[in-house]
């Protein structure tokens, strides 16, 4: 308890950190150590991709309020007290673009703590990759602090983003979100040979040809055959049926385990 006599030759800090019980330490810590430390605000931001007609699309919002009013931003927001980052992602995706997001489709990407990244004050963001099927396009609607939901094309060969055919530049984005998008491209391309989560960009059921088309889009020029695809990702997918195409052989259908 606070006010307990400290043995001679020992500092109060040493006593409570080393010799007291954890309950006594925490009581002392919250009274003695917390006030001098400033605390950052913590946000989550999501690089939310989908794969539509052979192109990678990125869900962004156009901010309706300061800071960076009218700029494009990743879906995200401040974490609530008592929630972890993944559940904050689920909540923000629901609030901002009206989508239900399963936890398995959320992948932590990078923590960004660059001083001055947010003009409102000290803010740390935990950025995530989010994989959405193309049917998500039919469900999105703007909410919360989003003026509108914007879908941009992302060229994984050049790293460039396009809106209505116009190339976007760094100043079009809020905060440091342009750099976070670039980091997401690098992460996906580095991990594609051993991490099958990118396959969540496909529909629930898909063919090997669908998977090959996605690999080629994410890693342009990368050579991948049907046999190699099944060798790499066979442990993560299961065969669920087949379909017949006129004048062609039967094609197997798969889904992620």
Where are these regions (language model features)?
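N-terminal leader/linker segments that precede catalytic domains of diphosphate-processing enzymes
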Residues: 1-168, 173, 178-257
């Amino acid at each position: 308890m606070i006010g307990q006599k400290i043995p001679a030759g020992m500092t109060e800090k040493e006593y409570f950190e080393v010799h007291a019980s954890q309950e006594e330490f925490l009581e002392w810590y919250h009274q003695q150590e917390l006030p001098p430390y400033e605390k950052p605000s913590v946000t989550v931001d999501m690089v939310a991709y989908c794969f539509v007609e052979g192109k990678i699309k990125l869900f962004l919002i156009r901010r309706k309020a300061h800071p960076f009013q009218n700029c494009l931003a990743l879906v995200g927001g401040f974490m609530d007290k008592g929630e972890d980052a993944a559940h904050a992602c689920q909540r923000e995706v629901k609030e901002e673009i009206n989508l239900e997001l399963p936890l398995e489709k959320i992948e932590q990407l990078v923590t960004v703590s660059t001083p001055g990244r947010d003009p409102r004050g000290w803010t740390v963001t935990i950025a995530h990759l989010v994989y959405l099927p193309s049917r998500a396009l039919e469900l999105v609607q703007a909410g919360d602090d989003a003026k509108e939901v914007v879908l941009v094309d992302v060229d994984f060969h050049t790293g460039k983003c396009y809106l209505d055919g116009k190339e976007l530049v760094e100043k079009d984005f809020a905060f440091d979100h342009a750099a976070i998008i670039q980091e997401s491209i690098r992460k996906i391309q580095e991990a594609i040979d051993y991490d099958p989560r990118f396959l969540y960009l496909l529909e629930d059921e898909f063919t090997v040809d669908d998977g090959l088309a996605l690999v080629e889009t994410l890693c342009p020029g990368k050579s991948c055959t049907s046999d190699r695809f099944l060798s790499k990702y066979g442990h993560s997918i299961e065969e669920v049926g087949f379909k017949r195409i006129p004048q062609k052989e039967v094609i197997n259908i798969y889904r992620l385990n």
